[in-house]
Structure formats: C-alpha cells, structure tokens
Amino acid sequence: MTAPTREVLLLDDDRWDRVLLATKGEAAACYQCGTCTATCPWGLVAGPSIGVRSVMRRAQLGIDGWAEAVWRCTTCGACEEHCPHEVPISDVMLGLRSLAWEERSVPQGLSGVLWDMHWDGNPWGRPPSARSAWANGLDIPRFDATKHSVLLYVGCTASYDRRGQKIARAVVSVLRAAGISFGTLGDEEPCCGDPARSLGNEEYFKRIAQANSHKLAAERATEVVTVSPHCYDTFTHYPGIGEAFRVRHYSQLLRDLVAEGKVSFAGVEPTKVTFHDPCYLARHHDETEAPRTIMAAIPGVSIEEMERSREETLCCGGGGGRMWMETLPEDRFATSRAREAAGTGASYLVTTCPHCISCLEDGASVAGARNLKVMDLAELAVLAGIGAAAPTEASR
C-alpha cells in the first residue's frame, strides 16, 4: 500500500533573516489568529483566496509557498483594520514582494511597468511630451511659487488614461470655481513612484522619492494637491514630507472650502447618490468625512450609504499594483461593489479615485447596473454648479 504524499517543510534560517529584513521585523508580529484571512476581500469571489495567515506563517518559517499569493494582494488594508495585534500586513506584503524581486519570482510583465517608468516617466509607457495633453484648451499656467498657492499634481493615470483625464479636467474646474490660484508642472511632472512602491521595488521607489523631493524643493511648492489618493499616499512616504511641503487630496481641500463657507453649489434635481470610499483614503489615511461633507452641501443630493462603507469599504481591486495585472472577470471585487451600490437605489456611484472609477465602471457593466452612473466627486461638484460663495455681511 502506497503511503499518502505529504508536503515536507524545510525551514530556512537564512531566508527567515531576509524576510525579517525585508519586512522590517513586522512579519514576526503575527500570532496566527486568522482574522486577516477572514476579512480579506479575496474570500468574496470565485477564485482562490490569498490565505493571509498562511502567507504570514510561511514567511515566519522562511519557507516557500507565499510568492504567488503576495501578488494577489491589493494592499487594501481590510485585514489591518481588524487585526487585533495591529500588524501592518500591507507593509509586510510589500516587503515580501521586495524579496520576490530579489529572487526573481515576479509575474510576467511587471518589470516592463517599471522600465516604462524609467524610460518614459510613467507606467503607461506614453511619451513625456504628451503628459499635459489632457489639459488642451484649459490654459493652465506652469506652477510659479510667487503666483500660485497650490501645485496641482495630476498623476500618471489622470494624465494619460482617457477616463482619468476627465477627472483631472473636473478638478481644474473645481479649483477655478473656488478661486484657488494654482499651476501644474505640465510635461515636467514626474511620476510619484506609486507603481514602484506598490509593486514592492523599494530601492527604485527610494530613488524616485529622493529625485522628486529635490524637484519639489526647487519649485518651492508649499502645498501639493493631488487628483489621486494613490499619489497622495505615496507622497506621505517621502522622507521629511511634513517639513518640505503640505500634501492633500483635492477632496480634503474642497471639504475645507465648504466648511469655511467659501464655495457653494447651485444644486441638482433630487438625486440619490452612494459613495465608494477608496481604500487609500478611508483606511490608509482615516479620511471618510471629507466627501460626505461636500455631498451634504449640495442641494438635492440624498446620500444612501452602502453596508460596507467608510473604514469597512470594499476594495475596488485596483490597488497594490493590481492595475497592472490581469484579474479574471469572476474575481473582480468591483462587480460585487456595483451590485451593492445599485441595491441602494442610487442613481450615482461617486468616488474620489481614478483607479476606483476604472474598476467600478467595469464592474457596473459586468453587473448589468445600467441605471447606475459612476462618477468622481469633482464631476458631481461641477454638475452641481460649484462656485465661490457670495460674501456675507460678516465677511464684508
């Protein structure tokens, strides 16, 4: 009788040392409760789950078996939100990816993304000379610290992706309506480095961050406002970020303008909207109220919350470098999200992230949610007739 085949686990102390170094020691903090696996959105779709606890355990033991799983992670942070030991699991995953680069265990095509960044300054492989083509006809000035209070950082997706370009143009309309003096870097705008960081190539990201820090210092920018939450998050990982310049997502700036009574909205016909919180605002930066403050200020808008909202948001599936990897239709979180949004009876599914917009529009199409329109908050603000508020007696 043949004995059953069993997996033999060979512990590798040398590899464990490299795991510790790559994850800055955080991989050792996991004590295997399994909460991470239970809350991972991969458990909601047809494909195999990541098995986060298993990845962490194999990493702790220095054994193989985690390489494929770490590339499925969207770094959404759902696991971290519920981890009783507060292990920074997303950072551990990025650390393991950095080790995978060293061991050349990287999915096909990802090195090409980084080479596009190296040669063309963007992960889309588009020419730098076309970076500001999205702004044709808008007459946006080149940023000048003596004239402008805000440097608008557009980002690669909003610069090159056709749908993202519409978002960038809407943000420009919002800033102009609010009376904000701003400029951009035009074709000189560099990639923030998000793809390098999210794909785990830490050394390349550090070089990008250093070069960009020098460039922004030379521009004498004191406030940088981003179109994408991913760019916003990436800038916060630059060394000395708070000392050099302030960085905000555009929704945070608009929230402050609304709260200060500096902008108002003409309003819309009575409309139900629901909001999808981007992971890189809601979980990574605890920012959930800014968009709701803005929408609540628009006459005619009624906010219908989805069950999974704010810090409990469901990832769209586009983070953690997954925008550059293929996901089977049955494994796309955004399809479930679109169905959830349609179930609220809302006419508009609003969000504040170009990656989320791309995934959710695809999800709405697959889900057959024909009556649900996906739009960015800046587009809703323009639709609602944003403008500078009329001065009150107290402000005259």
Question: Over which residues does each language-model region extend?
Answer:
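Hydrophobic scaffolds flanking metal-cofactor catalytic centers in soluble metalloenzymes
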Residues: 29-35, 39-60, 67-68, 164, ...
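Iron-sulfur-cluster electron-transfer modules
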Residues: 18, 24-27, 44, 56-227, ...
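Ferredoxin-type iron-sulfur electron-transfer modules in oxidoreductases and energy-metabolism complexes
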Residues: 3-24, 45-72, 76-78, 86-120, ...
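C-terminal amphipathic alpha-helical segment
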Residues: 259-295
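Cofactor-cradling patches in redox/metallo enzymes
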Residues: 159-249, 280-297, 302-396
